[in-house]
A protein has these predicted regions:
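Extended amphipathic alpha-helical elements
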Residues: 1-75
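Non-catalytic terminal and connector segments of soluble metabolic enzymes
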Residues: 3, 20-21, 53, 59-60, ...
Length: 367
């Protein structure tokens, strides 16, 4: 935790008691409680991940490590795997993301992109020499894909089990390919066979070379609005539902998507226009820095429309309670909790659409 008064970073011990959702914070250096044990309902077990930032009574705590017993309990056999959503209709993306999250996977990295032949050859090296390989390569490289890093116990095997067999017709009921696949080629998604393969593919898809992403971000920074899915949306499991609502609307499509971790200083800079306008400015910044968020570049299908103004209507007013009364079909009416945890941020001013998208997909993407 950064102590502004002392101008230093303090190392603390956070103890979480899941049976009554209480917390205790100890300053081990000074040998005293910074916070005596008290119930704190906003903190969820799912938020206690190494690398996350949690907000305890307006104090931002960065989780750097955990005790051996905690690691054994929470992270036993936990793995990362690489998942690739193949070129499917955008209207299906939300359903697929919802399926993934309901199966108990945590999404820790995510972005859309287009892959080249070299990446595709590496991805399908297990079918090298097959007559079908050129067809597979052509299919996977001509459309847009979404790459995901999924975390769960025994994630590599679990993801392949969730996918089902290659042919959707013979895949087990309830598997992803049985639900949404068309044939052996258009079978929704790809999974790695080994941990080593998953690690290599994650590096290829999300890695950087000389400061440039190997798979470029898809943002165009033209005629667009910015939409940020706030951290609580990810914790609540509503990412897929919001993506589906946007993609199935008649007016909009998502041209770029990526997951980010936002520092408090960046959140303050991004929301600076609201500093002297909204009394909840500080709380907005803290929430955006609490955990991972998902940034979208949203565009209108009809170029004659003002994308920012039209998309703001889909999101609804900032207060979810007001949305539920006046705009019950809006995103914030469905998934917002209060004026801070109101599901999404959307660009307010028409001239700020490109600037806000640039902040995430240029500045933060290369930070």
């Amino acid at each position: 935790m950064f102590d502004e008064d002392a101008d230093e970073i303090k190392e603390l011990v956070l103890i979480f008691f899941p049976f009554d959702n209480s917390v205790q914070i100890i300053n081990t250096k000074e040998g005293k409680n910074l916070l005596k044990r008290v119930q704190f309902p906003p903190l969820k077990r799912e938020m206690l991940q190494i690398g996350n930032i949690v907000n305890i009574f307006s104090k931002l705590l960065y989780i750097r490590d955990c005790a051996p017993a905690t690691r054994k309990l929470l992270y036993h056999n936990v793995q990362s795997t690489f998942a690739l959503i193949k070129p499917v209709p955008p209207s299906a993306h939300g359903k697929i993301i919802t399926f993934i999250m309901k199966k108990g996977f945590r999404i820790v990295r995510m972005k859309n992109g287009k892959i080249d032949k070299d990446f595709a050859m590496e991805l399908y090296q297990n079918v090298a020499g097959s007559n079908l390989l050129p067809i597979i390569i052509n299919y996977i490289t001509t459309g847009e894909v979404i790459g995901l890093e999924l975390v769960a116990p025994d994630a590599v095997k679990k993801w392949r089990d969730c996918l089902g067999s290659t042919d959707p017709a013979t895949a087990a009921p309830g598997t992803l390919r049985r639900l949404y696949g068309e044939d052996k080629l258009r079978n929704v998604a790809h999974g790695c066979v080994t941990v080593e393969e998953a690690t290599a593919m994650l590096d290829m898809f999300f890695g950087y070379e000389k400061g440039i992403p190997r798979i470029p971000f898809r943002a165009t920074f033209k005629n667009c609005a910015c939409c940020i899915l706030k951290p609580h949306v990810i914790i609540d499991g509503n990412v897929g539902a919001i993506l589906e609502q946007i993609a199935t609307s008649e007016k909009f499509y998502i041209s770029a998507i990526a997951m980010f971790s936002v520092k408090l200083s960046n959140a303050q800079e991004f929301f600076e226009v609201y500093k002297e306008v909204l009394p909840e400015y500080e709380a907005m910044c803290i929430h955006l820095a609490e955990g991972k968020c998902i940034a979208l570049e949203v565009k209108c299908n009809d170029l004659s429309l003002n994308c920012v103004c039209e998309f703001r209507k889909l999101c609804g007013p900032r207060d979810p309670d007001l949305c539920r009364q006046l705009y019950p079909d809006s995103i914030r009416a469905h998934y917002g909790k209060d004026i801070i945890h109101n599901a999404v941020h959307c660009t307010d001013l028409p001239e700020d659409g490109e600037l806000e998208v640039e902040y995430f997909f240029k500045l933060l993407a290369n930070d």
